[in-house]
């Protein structure tokens, strides 16, 4: 392990946003505390799982179009799973909070599938906050921050046929770029260009 990788890991663990040079590429680490001006943002932990399960169970439409289920085990797995070739140091599983109340959950991968792209693996709103343009405001802040860190796009996958998700993401500037089969379920891979 090089001194750079251990130094990056240490800085990231304590929440610093720094720039590191690898050849000619500038890598700007994500500081999740800067993802929202309105809500406090923090990493979600195992002790938060019951709260996450409750919010997920209330979002019944989402689970009609995916193989995922809102269980403790699935959420714990989601907190740790990364795409092939991506380390846990590039994964951020966090919540947006209004005081003690969880407003939204997000799983964000830095540098997937390319270094200049951020990937939203999961985004779910607390139903109490839905229909009030809060989700759109959160996504707007996240996208703005990603642009400021040098990302050129944000990518995600929408479960094909899910009208709620399709409407939300297209309303927020994401365009389907291709379809992918994942375990027998069709996903619409969508992207929002930032440059």
Predicted regions and their residues:
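Short, often N-terminal, low-complexity regions
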Residues: 13-14, 18-19
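Conserved acetyl-CoA-binding loop of GNAT-fold acetyltransferases
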Residues: 16, 170-179
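Active-site acidic-Proline motif in GNAT/NAT acetyltransferases
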Residues: 126-128, 132, 160-161
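Conserved beta-strand-loop-alpha-helix junction that forms the acyl-donor binding cleft
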Residues: 156-166, 183-185
